[in-house]
A protein has these predicted regions:
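An aromatic/glycine/proline-enriched structural segment found at the starts
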Residues: 6, 11-68, 74-77
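M16 family metallopeptidases and their MPP-like homologs
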Residues: 1, 8-15, 67-83, 104-196
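Solvent-exposed aromatic/hydrophobic patches embedded in short alpha-helical segments
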Residues: 91-95, 99, 175, 189-190
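Active/ligand-binding-proximal structured segments within catalytic/core domains
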Residues: 72, 82-96
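Hydrophobic (often cysteine-bearing) scaffold residues that line and stabilize catalytic clefts
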Residues: 23, 87, 143
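Short amphipathic C-terminal alpha-helix that caps PH/PH-like domains
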Residues: 27-31, 91, 144-152
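Extracellular/periplasmic bilobed ligand-binding domains
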Residues: 25-29, 88, 103
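A generic secondary-structure signal for well-formed alpha-helical elements
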Residues: 22, 30-38, 98, 107, ...
Length: 196
């Protein structure tokens, strides 16, 4: 009762090999017994938004194996649509491909550059993209310049055809492999219906 005082506005999603005749009485017993009112469920916007503008923070700590960890995070408002989520995926994949060549293979400055993005629709429709890597104290400035230069280049010139094709092939293969995975369907349904 403390955790679920009111189930109004809840959406329950089931995926997988489920016999509806077996599921129905379980839903009626366990979910149907949760009280619900006519009052719509709302959330509290605590206004904890990312800081606007550029922020540089440097932290130092003693370590047995000295290293420098670099983390860039870009945020902003963006309509929460499947098309925008897909565009962000293409961008992160294209940057990952470029950094693999320019930062890891050509400079040998890190084991890898992680690039990942996400979108949100509550409390506002936003995106976030993070670029993160570890390196040594001698190479951090040089690698940071390369990372930002590649980002500017893709913003001004767009992605390379080969980056688009590689990403398309990866996404198609990932989708085909995921068709038999419950998690794929759950993520799709949550993305499609989660934002209303």
């Amino acid at each position: 009762k403390k955790l679920f005082p009111d189930a109004n506005s809840f959406r329950f999603t089931f995926v997988g090999n489920i016999d509806p005749e077996v599921l129905k009485p379980l839903v009626e017993k366990y979910i149907g017994s949760i009280p619900a009112s006519k009052k719509p469920m709302t959330f509290v916007d605590d206004k904890a938004y990312p800081v606007k503008g550029e922020v540089n923070d440097t932290f130092t700590a003693k370590m047995q194996q000295p290293k420098v960890s670099i983390n860039y995070t870009f945020t902003g408002e963006m309509d929460y649509t499947i098309e925008n989520k897909l565009a962000l995926t293409y961008l992160t994949q294209a940057l990952s491909s470029r950094y693999l060549v320019s930062v890891r293979e050509e400079k040998g400055g890190t084991y890898g550059v992680q690039v990942y993005g996400s979108t949100e629709y509550i409390p506002r429709e936003t995106y976030s993209m993070t670029i993160a890597f570890d390196t040594n104290d001698e190479m951090d400035d040089e690698l940071c310049e390369i990372v930002i230069a590649e980002l500017k280049k893709i913003a001004e010139e767009g992605p390379l055809t080969e980056d688009i094709e590689k990403t398309r092939e990866f996404l198609l293969k990932d989708w085909q492999n995921g068709l038999e995975q419950n998690g794929t369907w759950m993520r799709y349904l949550q993305m499609k219906y989660g934002s209303g």
